[in-house]
Amino acid sequence: MRLAKRHENLRPSGMVRMFQAIERMEGVLNLSIGEPDFDTEPDIIEAAAKAARDGFTHYPPLQGFYDVREAVCRYWERHHGLRSKPEEVYMAVGAMQVSHLAFGALLDPGDEVLLVEPCFPPYFSQVEGNGGVPVAVPTREESGFAPTVEDLRRAVTPRTRGLLLNSPCNPSGRVVPRAQLEEIAAFVQEHDLFVLSDEIYESLVFSGEHVCLATLPGMRERTLTMGGLSKSHCMTGWRLGYAIGPEEVMRTMTLISAVQTYGLNTLGQKAALYALDTQDAKLLERRAVFADRMAAVAERLNSMKGIR
């Protein structure tokens, strides 16, 4: 069967090839993927089971249940000061669907998107798959692997349409400081760009603060915030992501997804509703555990010759 020409050069990423290789190995400690080793809390699982017993076994609203989107709004206002309304939230099949739909909603053929490196490799394929052109923006150790305005100015062109910013970052772990984010925000407004702000690790900042980009002056109307419950609530297998952004973008993403997934599974959404409203103490407990582990690994690595 002949494949579409646009997919002829599509190849598994290095990360996918590595996962495929270790499937055949024994005794491998996989430190590569951002997945908590904690299981989902039993009361969250029970919330999903109760939803099934209560009859939430039919097609969901395409944008997501209204009460679940309200819970997303409450969570982000409570934790990060981002005020939004349910009409500005889209419930997705994981945060990866958010970025794919967002690029589909915002890019015209040939539009360029600045991708700050190091970054999550699938972003490049998502931009290309939606007709855009990914433009890598390298960062340096001396700037803490955070993008500077000078880095962005070297990469921007008249065809640049947007910026994808990931803070806290996968894979470097860097968190862009507030002052640097303010400079980036000014640059974005100067060039009239949209920002896809991947903040999926917002709950796992061990020192300093996480600043939600959309809360900065002038950024609310041009920022699409990506989030989800995979990292914060140990629910990677549930595939629960969401976007927060301008209503017109949420509507367009919803229309695109109508011919793809036709909504996010109902039981997962009801589990998310419960989790977002009840698990703040658990988030703090797990973050403390992860912080201890991080410190132990850093101490061990720093004691090794040739590793810095």
Residue ranges of model-derived segments:
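N-terminal small-domain helix-loop-helix segment of the aminotransferase-like
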Residues: 5-94, 101, 275-278
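Short acidic capping loops at alpha-helix termini that bridge into adjacent secondary structure
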Residues: 83-89, 109-112, 159, 220-223
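Conserved PLP-anchoring active-site segment centered on the Schiff-base-forming lysine
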Residues: 105-127
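Helix C-cap/helix->beta junction micro-motif
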Residues: 25, 130, 190-191, 304
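Active-site phosphate-binding strand-loop segment of PLP-dependent enzymes
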Residues: 135, 140-207
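A short helix-loop-beta submotif of the ANL/AMP-binding
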Residues: 129-135
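Conserved core segment of the aminotransferase class I/II
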Residues: 216, 221-291, 295-302
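A short helix->loop->beta-strand "cap" motif at the edges of active sites that frequently abuts
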Residues: 111, 132, 190-194, 219-221
